[in-house]
Amino acid sequence: MVKPLPRLRLQGFNNLTKALSFNIYDVCYARTEEERQRYIEYIDEQYDADRLTQILTDVAEIIGANILNIARQDYDPQGASVTILISEEPVIDKKQAGRELISDAVVAHMDKSHITVHTYPETHPQEGIATFRADIDVATCGVISPLKALNYLIETLESDIVIMDYRVRGFTRDVKGKKHYIDHKINSIQHFLAKNVKSRYEMIDVNVYQENIFHTKMHLKDFDLDQYLFEERAKNLSFKERMKIETLLKREIEELFHGRNLSE
């Protein structure tokens, strides 16, 4: 739960911009080129523009935002993008949320709050590794907090690795003229995660408190090879094959988690 500071009487609108950025990775091993292609097709179908639109619509509801406009696109050969413009004030009936075009007037709100997602499926050309990355941004202007959507996004996208950034920009002025650069308490993004989420992940923080920048990296603690194999079971592989695949997968996870290639 987001803990607000003592309620402020503001001079006008709350001008703070709060932005939560996610990079969520799913890692998989597919033995043959044909299996890797089927993995890409599977991911492309599971996370097409329609499904992503529903996920982001749920996010808008969770954070208490109202939908202004939705733009979505599936790409060839793979990938999808969805952008939803949101506001604090009611604009349309929720039953209309699935319509792409609401009104030309929503262009005026494009510098305000929005939720976006882009997907990036890819495969290694030789080693059988396939990954899926979802890049999600939730940016709000005013009292709405994107942190409320943390647990829903992590659970919904079944994440192996999560890289999160949260930052607060701008200021809001109270009735006495004093500027406030943040309107809620936060020491770490981890404090906003549910217990069942925290129990499953190894996490590290890199925070710059004086700049209101918070960064958390997470990866699953437990490694179950079957969870990473596509169209295959570990019991059908030889011990040597299992060890080779496990080494490849763990290396891939470590490199994505740290954001750099490890030396041989």
UniProtKB/Swiss-Prot annotation:
Pathway: Amine and polyamine biosynthesis; S-adenosylmethioninamine biosynthesis; S-adenosylmethioninamine from S-adenosyl-L-methionine: step 1/1. Its cofactor is pyruvate. The modification Pyruvic acid (Ser) is found at residue 113. The active site is at residues 113, 118, 141. Pfam families: AdoMet_dc. The record marks 112-113 as: Cleavage (non-hydrolytic). Its EC number is 4.1.1.50. It comes from the Bacteria. One of its GO terms (biological process) is spermidine biosynthetic process. Keywords: Autocatalytic cleavage, Decarboxylase, Lyase, Polyamine biosynthesis, Pyruvate, S-adenosyl-L-methionine, Schiff base, Spermidine biosynthesis, Zymogen. GO terms for cellular component: cytosol. GO terms for molecular function: adenosylmethionine decarboxylase activity. Is synthesized initially as an inactive proenzyme. Formation of the active enzyme involves a self-maturation process in which the active site pyruvoyl group is generated from an internal serine residue via an autocatalytic post-translational modification. Two non-identical subunits are generated from the proenzyme in this reaction, and the pyruvate is formed at the N-terminus of the alpha chain, which is derived from the carboxyl end of the proenzyme. Belongs to the prokaryotic AdoMetDC family. Type 2 subfamily. Catalyzes the decarboxylation of S-adenosylmethionine to S-adenosylmethioninamine (dcAdoMet), the propylamine donor required for the synthesis of the polyamines spermine and spermidine from the diamine putrescine. Heterooctamer of four alpha and four beta chains arranged as a tetramer of alpha/beta heterodimers. This is S-adenosylmethionine decarboxylase proenzyme.
